[in-house]
Curated annotation (Swiss-Prot):
It comes from the Bacteria. InterPro entries: Spore_germ_GerPE (IPR024496). One of its GO terms (biological process) is sporulation resulting in formation of a cellular spore. It holds the Pfam family GerPE. Keywords: Germination, Sporulation. Induction: Expression is sigma K-dependent and negatively regulated by GerE. Required for the formation of functionally normal spores. Could be involved in the establishment of normal spore coat structure and/or permeability, which allows the access of germinants to their receptor. The gene is gerPE. This is Probable spore germination protein GerPE.
Length: 128
């Protein structure tokens, strides 16, 4: 992995989501995961034990295909200037499991799973 010296003059961030990363500099590996269950009801009430991730198929990692890493490529790189210079970064929002990096990363894995459940008393919500 190439090594750099990252220089950032000014950073402005308004909001970072769950498991979001803003990184200046090199990283060996990054594994960002977030999971959420959002239940919207017409009449608000809480049912004990309803927020179990294993009850929903979307939260199992069995269906995620992660490519296998291969190192068959031979490189000869001359890094004449190891500096990464950035003047200004303005970031409004970085959502769940998002990554903004100034630098090098050898391996990154980002996974965000959110299920939204809407429960209404009537078949269709009233348009008032």
């Amino acid at each position: 992995m190439l090594h750099h010296v990252s220089i950032v003059q000014n950073v402005s961030i308004i909001s970072l989501g769950i498991a979001a990363v803003f990184q200046v500099g090199d990283a060996n590996q990054m594994e960002l995961k977030s999971r959420a269950i959002a239940v919207h009801r017409e009449i608000p009430f809480y049912i004990r034990g309803e927020g179990r991730f294993d009850a929903f198929e979307i939260f199992t990692d069995e269906h995620i295909t992660i490519p296998k890493r291969t190192t068959d490529v031979k490189l000869n790189i001359v890094n004449e200037c190891p500096f990464i210079e950035v003047n200004n970064v303005e970031l409004r929002t970085l959502l769940n499991s998002g990554c903004f990096q100034i630098g090098n990363v050898d391996y990154g894995f980002n996974n965000s799973r959110i299920i939204q459940i809407r429960q209404y008393i009537t078949d269709e919500p009233s348009a008032q």
